[in-house]
Amino acid sequence: MSRFFSRGYHYDTASSSEDEELLTSSEEELMSSSEEEVVSDDSFFNDSESESAESDDDSDGKPYGPDWFKKPQFRKGGAPGGSGASRFLKGNADSSDESDDEGKKVVKSARDKLLDELNNTYNKIDAAEMTQDWTTILSEFESATKLLVKAQQQNMGTPNVFVRVVAQVEDLVAETSQAEIKNKIVAKAYNTVKQRVRKIARENEELLAKFRQHPEAFEKDSTVEFGQARDFDASDLTLMGRKVADRSAIVSSPSDFFSALRIVIDSRGKKGTDIQAQIKTMEELVSISKSPYESIIAYLNLIPIRFDACANLAYQPLEQWKASHNNVTSLLELLEANIESYHVTELAPRNEFIEEEPQPNENGVRMILGSVFTFVERLDDEFNKSLLNTDPHSSDYLDRLRDEQSVYNLILRSQLYLEKVLPEDTASKHLCRSFVRRLDHIYYKTSKLVDIVERAAWASVPANSSSKYITYSDDPDYNFKLVNTLCTVVSSEQEMLKRRATLYQIYYYALNNQFSKAKEMLVQSNVRNSINSQDPTIQILFNRVVVQLGLAAFKLCLVEDCHQILNEVSTASHLRDIMGQQSLQRVSNNISSNGTVTPTEMLCLPFHQHINLDLIDAVFMTCSLLIEIPHMAAFYSGIKVKRIPYSQKSIRRALEHYEKSSFQGPPETLRDHVIHAAKAMQRGNWAQCINYLRSISTWTLLGDKMEKVLEQLAERIQIESLKTYIFTYKRFYTKLSVQKLSELFSLPTEQVISVIQTLENTINIKGSLNEAKEMLIFDKGDEITKLEEVAIKLTKETKYQSERLNNVSQRQ
C-alpha cells in the first residue's frame, strides 16, 4: 500500500528523505519502548518499572507529514479509539473494547529475563525449604550458579537476587542437621549443596557480609558491578573481551586473582567465548601472580586454552606452538624449583576450591591435580601435524624439523620430573607413556644420531639430574641399552603398549645392522600371528619392521632371506598406504569411505621417517635377479628344479614384458637397469651386470655401507653368473676347464670348485669333477641342442596356426 501511494503522491518535506512504511500501533509501542531502554541505559543495573506514556497530540491536531492522506486509524500515532491496522490482525477482530482489555504487550530485555529466572529460582528454593526437598534445592541452586556465569558474561555483574539465593541456601544448610535426613538420596543432595554453597559463599564473601548488614538494600532486582564489590578501577586488563580491573587491583588480594581465574574457567568451552581474550587474561594473571601456587594454577589453565584456540585448525600455528612450548618449559622450571613444596600429578585428589591451597601431606608437599606430560604429548602431536601439513621438499620442512630436539628435551625433562613425584610402586606404570614417546623419536634413527639427540637432551635438563632407569653415558653400547631398557619397562607394565615397544626394538636393531637378533626377536614375539586384528597404527609399524628387516638382510648380502622377507610386502598393490607414507588428503578420503575411527594423523608418518620406495624396489628386484636368473637357466636347460613362485615385481615377469616390447632402448629407469643387468647375467657377462646395477642412484640411500654392500653384491653376481653360464651352455660342452671358468669370472679356483660341488649336491647337472678337480665333465644326456629347440618351437607354432586357419575355413 505504501509503495502504491509513494508512486501516486509526491510531497516535499524537510523532516524525511525516504518513504515510510505503514506501521501498526503495536509496532510503534515496541519501538518506543526500545528507544526508552536506550535512553535510560545510564542506569542499566537499576530496575525501572515505569514505562513512557504514549503521546497522542499529533492525532488531535491538523494532519501533516507524509501520511496526511491516510485515515486516522492508519496515521502515525493512530486514532484515539483505534488500534490502526492491528485491529485486522488475528485475535483483534472482535471489538476495540476487547483489544483495550488485553493491554499492551511487554517486551523484556535479556537482563529482565535473567532476573526473572533468578527470582523464580529463589521462590522455588523457598518452597522446597518447607518440605526439606534437597534434591530440588540442589537443582535450583545449580541453575542459579549457571545464571550467574551468564550474567557476568553479559557484563551484568552479580545480581542482588543471586546474593539473596546464596544467603538463603547458606542459612538453610546451617539450620539443617544431616542426622535428621534418613533418605540416602536426599542426604547426598544435602552434602552436595553444603559443599557448593560453601564454595560460592567464599567467592562472594564481601557481598554476603553487606547483605547481612543491610538486607533491605538487596530487595531490588539490581546487580552489583564486578568491580564495585572489590573496589576495582577501570584499566586495560581484558577479561572475556571486556575491561574488568587494573593490574594493581587484581593483585591486591588472592581472592581477586582467583575470582578472575574462576570466570575464565567457568566460561571455557562455552559458545560465544573469545578464546584470544581468555589467553590474554591468563597471560596477565601469570605475569601478576605472587605465589608459586598462583603461578602453577595459572599455567595449568593457560596451556589448555592455547590448545583450544587451534582445535578447529589442521595444526597449531608456529607462533602459538612456540608460546605453548615456552609455557610448558616455564611450568617445568617452576615445578622443579618448588619440588619440595608442590607436586603436580594425575594421582592428586581433586580440589574443589582452587582459592585454597591443598593441605600438605606427611612430607610437607602439596599435591595439585594436573598432568604436565599431557601438555608435552599435545605439543608433540601438534609438531607432527605441522610436519604432515608442510611440503617435505621445501626449506620450511627442514626449519620446522629443527624443533624436534626441543620436543625431545621436554619429553625427557617431564620424565625426570615424574620420576621424582610419582610413588615408587606405581612409577613404572605411569612412565610408560613417556618411554613410548621417547621411542617414537629415536627408534628410526641410527645409533650415531641417537647419541647426538641424547647428549643434547641431557645437556638441557638441570645439572646433576639422573634417572633411576638409565642415565646418559659415553658407553658405546649406551644407545642399545637405552632402547632395551625403555622397551623392557613398557612391555612389562602395559600390555596394550607391549607390541608397539617390541616392534620399536626390532626396528632399531634391524636398522643398526643387527639382523640376526632382530629376526630372532620377531619370530619369538609372535606378533605376526595376530597382526590382522591389531590397530592400524600397529599394522603400519609391523610393515615398516618387515621392510627394515629385509634391508638389513640385504646389507649383509643375505639374498635369500631378503627376498623371502620382502616378497609379501613389496609386492602389495598399495605399498605406500600400508607403510603409512601416503598423503593426508588420501588418508582422509580412505577414512571417509571406510568409516575408520583412527585419527588421520596417526595413519601418516612425517616425511623424514619414510623408507624410500625406490630403495625397496631396487633391493627386491636385485635379489630376484640373483635367485631367479640361475633358476630360469636351469629350468630351460632341462634340469628338474623346484618351481619358485613369482610376483608382478619379480625379474621373470619383468623379462617377459621386456621381450614382448617392440622397442628396447637403453636403460633409463631403475627397472630398466635391473632388466639389462639380468640380460647381461643370462649371457654370462657378469662385469656388465655389475655396471648396470652400480649405475642405480638409489644405492646412495644405504649411506656409508654402500661400497661394502656393492662389493659383496659384485661377488655374489660373479657366483650366480657362473651358475647361469654352466646351466645355459653345458649342452654345448663335454667338459669345462676349472681354470678357464676361474679366469672367465675372476674367481679363485677354490671358489669355482666349491660352486661346482654345490651344484652336484643340490642340482643334478649330470656332470662331475675329475679326480684332479681340473675339469668339469658332463654326461651325455637327452638334452636337445639350441637348433633342435628352435625347430621344435617352430613346429609347434606352425601346427597352431594351421589348426587356427582350418577352424576359420570351416566356419566360412
From Swiss-Prot:
Residues 1-105 are annotated as: Disordered. GO terms for biological process: formation of cytoplasmic translation initiation complex; translational initiation. HAMAP family: eIF3c (MF_03002). Component of the eukaryotic translation initiation factor 3 (eIF-3) complex, which is involved in protein synthesis of a specialized repertoire of mRNAs and, together with other initiation factors, stimulates binding of mRNA and methionyl-tRNAi to the 40S ribosome. The eIF-3 complex specifically targets and initiates translation of a subset of mRNAs involved in cell proliferation. Component of the eukaryotic translation initiation factor 3 (eIF-3) complex. The gene is NIP1. Residues 607-783 form the PCI domain. InterPro entries: EIF3C, EIF3C_N_dom, PCI_dom. Keywords: Cytoplasm, Initiation factor, Protein biosynthesis. Residues 17-40, 48-59 have a biased composition (Acidic residues). Belongs to the eIF-3 subunit C family. It is found in: Cytoplasm. Its main location: cytoplasm. GO terms for cellular component: cytoplasmic stress granule; eukaryotic 43S preinitiation complex; eukaryotic 48S preinitiation complex; eukaryotic translation initiation factor 3 complex; eukaryotic translation initiation factor 3 complex, eIF3e; eukaryotic translation initiation factor 3 complex, eIF3m; multi-eIF complex. Disulfide bonds: none annotated. GO terms for molecular function: RNA binding; translation initiation factor activity; translation initiation factor binding. This is Eukaryotic translation initiation factor 3 subunit C.
